[in-house]
From Swiss-Prot:
Phylogenetic classification of the source organism: Bacteria, Bacillati, Bacillota, Bacilli, Lactobacillales
Intrachain disulfide bonds: none
EC code(s) of this entry: 4.4.1.21
Role according to the record: Involved in the synthesis of autoinducer 2 (AI-2) which is secreted by bacteria and is used to communicate both the cell density and the metabolic potential of the environment. The regulation of gene expression in response to changes in cell density is called quorum sensing. Catalyzes the transformation of S-ribosylhomocysteine (RHC) to homocysteine (HC) and 4,5-dihydroxy-2,3-pentadione (DPD).
Official protein name in the record: S-ribosylhomocysteine lyase
Alphabetic keyword roster: Autoinducer synthesis, Iron, Lyase, Metal-binding, Quorum sensing
Presence of keyword Nucleotide-binding: no
UniProt cross-references to HAMAP family, sorted A to Z: LuxS (MF_00091)
Family: Belongs to the LuxS family.
Species this chain originates from: Streptococcus agalactiae serotype V (strain ATCC BAA-611 / 2603 V/R)
Gene Ontology biological-process annotations: quorum sensing
Length: 160
């Protein structure tokens, strides 16, 4: 018998969200009491556009570094297959407003001055697709996203 599962992100009505936003998906408690929080970091309005893979890949690498410089507890920040944003998994209870501020600050760094030397993991030894990066694209997407404002609410615009 196959176990019935519900995947929250496929239950979300993508036609009513208002990107860019940070949305708390869930807080889960592990078997020994550890808490993890899962966030939807939606940078692009679903079904209207998608970040090109090279730009998204570079944003991913930069966020891995920049988020950790701004807040403790990051487990992972991985892109959605639809290329409209990221899942962000954190240790402990976290607040969507604080995470939105961290994402905003990280995107500001990407938009305003990081250089190729600042992008971690861009060698054949450190990346599984090291040729598929674009700092220019990452910076242009960051500027566009920031111009729209980062909300801490997926359904009503509340810019941080």
């Amino acid at each position: 018998m196959t176990k019935e599962v519900v995947v929250e992100s496929f239950e979300l009505d993508h036609t009513i969200v208002k990107a860019p936003y940070v949305r708390l998906i869930s807080e889960e408690v592990g078997p020994v009491g550890d808490i993890i929080t899962n966030f939807d970091i939606r940078l692009i309005q679903p079904n209207e556009n998608a970040i090109d893979t090279a730009g998204l890949h570079t944003i991913e690498h930069l966020l891995a570094k920049l988020i950790r410089q701004r807040i403790n507890g990051l487990i992972d920040c991985s892109p959605f297959g639809c290329r409209t944003g990221f899942h962000m998994i954190m240790w402990g209870k976290q607040d969507a407003t604080e995470i939105a501020k961290v994402i905003k600050s990280s995107l500001e760094a990407i938009a305003g001055g990081v250089t190729w030397e600042d992008v971690p993991g861009t060698t054949i030894e450190s990346c599984g697709n090291y040729k598929d990066h674009s700092l220019h694209s990452a910076q242009e997407w960051a500027k566009l996203i920031l111009s729209q404002g980062i909300s801490d609410n997926a359904f009503e615009r509340h810019i941080v």
